[in-house]
Amino acid sequence: MPILFALLAAFSNALNVVTQHTASIGDPSHRKGWRFVRYLVTNPLWLFGWVALAGAFVFQALALHNGLLSVVQPLLVTELVFALVLRRLWIHQRIRAVTWWAAALTCVTLALFISMSEPSGGDLTPTSEAWVSAVATTAGLVAVLALLGLRGAPVRRAALLGAATSILWALVAVFIKAMTDTLVQYGIGGMFTHWPVYALAVSGLLAELLNQVTLHVGPLSVSQPVIVVVDPIVSIALSVWIFAETFSEDALRLGISAAAFAAMCVSVIVLAHTAPSTMDPSPARVEPAIPPA
């Protein structure tokens, strides 16, 4: 079930991106300012995107509560694959063959990584020392990367801020898992008497704000692969650091899983770089005219 919930979360995220972006560029009057905002909030497609986003959060929470962080977060990479399918079937974009091959390789290597690494274990009650050390280290790393990303060329800024954003999203996943545990243990009322729900609210808000800044400072072809690749790497590190999750002790299996993970990262980068740069539908094919005899 955790794997199914994680895939549903990835699909819902892809649905959110495609629907809201399609709605935002589909205004026939090209309104600006408050008129554009009014157009969006009255657009059923844009509102449906928010429903999809809420569904993504619920599915991710269910996956993290019932499964391992080191399994759930890497599976969210499939958002790019789902988005590609939606763009082809719904928006009717023409997708290059290399992009489809990259998507297929992403799925295969992801499955190979999870099956060969054999993630297991996990401590449902991490120690205070683990929480403080992990959160302080990741928060400090986010701050350093964000400060370095304030200046420089657009590509450099997009890469640095993208890395900072992805680390924050990994931290958000950790807090989601902790919050669901307190919810089940203490109920809705008791959840608000414990810190994870507030840590989630603050980190989630900061992650979204930093994500918006990242999207505006540099090319998406740089920031998107960084965010998608760094998030599962940091999540796996935090799964071991905080929740004491373990992996196979067999050297061969670990070697294969590491190679599969590296190949997955490469395929994700290729997918992001070769996918259509916009959500605009591909123009219809025009058959060449037959010259008169």
List each model region and its residues:
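Polytopic alpha-helical membrane proteins, predominantly small-molecule transporters/carriers
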Residues: 1-293
